[in-house]
Amino acid sequence: RFNPDIVCVGEMRSSEAYSAQEAARTGHTVLTTIHSNSCESTYRRMVTLCKRKYDISDETLMSLVTEAFPIIVFSKQLEDRKRKVMEIMECEILPDGNRNYRTLYHYNIVENRLEGDRFIIHGEHERVQGISESLKKRFLENGMPKEQLVRWEGEEA
């Protein structure tokens, strides 16, 4: 029996999505990649992949994957061929079971032009909102030093 600090799933392409969410919901830190079109659609994609292994309702699987992966980082290759983190989102599960999708950071494109045969794209990352109280609690319970969390929250102001 192993007790890894971090589980890395190179890319979720099939039923390994179910195993990844199981590991994440049992206290392991799981890092993985998946192809999707946005932060929010990433959860629906995980549900689809999990269903390749188990016949579980979409709603149950959505509950499992949003609990397992509260933070999604969405990156995309833009027309200038550079990859950018476009959005970082938290899925907060509310006490009534509903979900609140919170955009934490967003990449704002401030210039997008064609120069000859090259695209020129400039932008900047913008903090949209802070993390939820429940995620702060989860970070602290899982070992994030309080000083680090306070310092990070200070950057939110």
Where are these regions (language model features)?
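Switch/coupling sub-region of P-loop NTPases
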Residues: 1-68, 76-77
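Context-gated lysine
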Residues: 51-53, 76, 82-84, 136-137, ...
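A general structural signal for short secondary-structure boundary/capping elements
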Residues: 55-57, 77-79, 117-125
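Phosphate-binding/switch region of NTP-binding enzymes
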Residues: 63-96
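NTP-binding/hydrolysis catalytic cores, primarily Walker-type P-loop NTPases
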Residues: 87-157
